[in-house]
Amino acid sequence: MGIDSTLTSELDIFPCRCLELGAGTGLVSLAVAKMLESIGSTDADIVATDYYPSVLENLRRNVTRNLLSEGVCVTSKFLDWSTFYHADIIADPVFEGGFDVVYGADIIYEALHATWIKSCLERLLCKPSTRRPDPTFHLVIPLRATHAVESSTIEMVFRDDGEIYEQQEHVLVVKYKEIIVCDAESGKDGEEVEYAYYKIGWS
């Protein structure tokens, strides 16, 4: 199952609200925006978020440089995972109302990141509805030996444990996992990098 085809089917419902966590340069959000343009989106909002001021400034510049059609809007916003989930009031209205699709690439590099992200998703990812039966968080991470412990936290934090969660109506769990093997950036013959692709949603 390709990531592109999966995202396309999920994005082809309008209006559509998308959120990127740890956007960095904004490459993923801009690629999603182009995908939305290609399928004729007339009402799509993409919010690309990051924490570091210097990264956000570069993100804003990249968004401004990439002209998009009127039907697709990309904005950049500050988001601190470690504080957002327990804030009494959502300070920025852009985060109100929930998101249909959330995605993140290479954003797990500390032991608490998965926990913080799950807590944020519990407030930000839309609950299942007739219009959007399966809101999803798409996560891709490189499987680095140096970050094996941090990577393992994803399946621990988003585990489907029926005994613990049976009394809760909606719980975020890993619904799909795929290992993707790519050639390494070094260009050396035979050198490859493995990525884990997760689809996380409400049980």
Model-derived segments and spans:
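S-adenosylmethionine-dependent methyltransferases
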Residues: 1-203
